[in-house]
Amino acid sequence: MIRTALLICVCASLAACAKPSTNSCEARADAMLDLSFGAFDQGPDGWRSLDGSLACPDSAPGVLAEYRHRHRDALSRPNISLLTWHEAQVRAAQGDDQRTAVRLMREAAFAGEPDWQRLYREGSIAFMEGDRSRLMAARDELAGLPRDPMLKGLNGSEVEWPPNLDVLDGLISCFGKPYSVAYVCRPAP
C-alpha cells in the first residue's frame, strides 16, 4: 500500500513536470502587460523571454497584440509599429498563416518612418511573398542609403549601418526557405 501510494505520488509529480502549466504562461504574460514599453520590448522579463521559452513558445504573439491594445493611448506610433513588427516576425518564424504575418508587417508602416526601416520592411515582405527581385531591390536601395547621424543604439552607441542589411542578405542567401531559417541565415561578419 505504501509502495502504491509512493508510485502514485511519483507519477503525479512526473506528469506535472511533463508539460508546463498553461496558467504559468498566462501569469507570465499578464505580468508583462504592466511593464514599461522599454522593459516590455527590450528587457529580460519582456515578451522576448516568452518567444525564446520552451515552456511558452506560443504566447509571444498574443502578448504583443494585447500590450499594443492595452497601451495604445500611451504608446507613440513608432512604438506601436515596432511591437506590430515584432508580432509579425514571431508569427512568421512560428510558421503561422503567412498572410497574417505579411498583413502585420504592412500595418507596421507609419508616416515619416525612416527609409532604412521602410526598406527593411519592404524587403522582408518581398521575401515572405516569394518575390526575389523586390527583395534584391530593397536590399540594394538599403545598402545605398547615406548614414543617419541621429540613429543610435540603446546605450547611445553607433549602430551598424545600414541597419538590418545583414538580415536582408540572409533572406537572399536562404531564399525559399522558411522565415525562421532565413532570418538567421546571415553572412559571417
Regions found by a protein language model. Give the residues of each.
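C-terminal motif of bacterial Sec signal peptides marking the signal peptidase cleavage site
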Residues: 15-16
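TPR/TPR-like (Sel1-like) alpha-helical repeat modules
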Residues: 105-110, 123, 132-150
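Single-residue signature of alpha-solenoid repeat helices
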Residues: 100-101
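"A position-specific structural signal for the A-helix of alpha-solenoid helical repeats
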Residues: 86, 90, 121-128
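N-terminal alpha-helical interaction modules that lie
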Residues: 20-87, 141-189
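Hydrophobic/aromatic side-chain positions at a characteristic register within alpha-helices
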Residues: 52-55, 92-93, 127-130
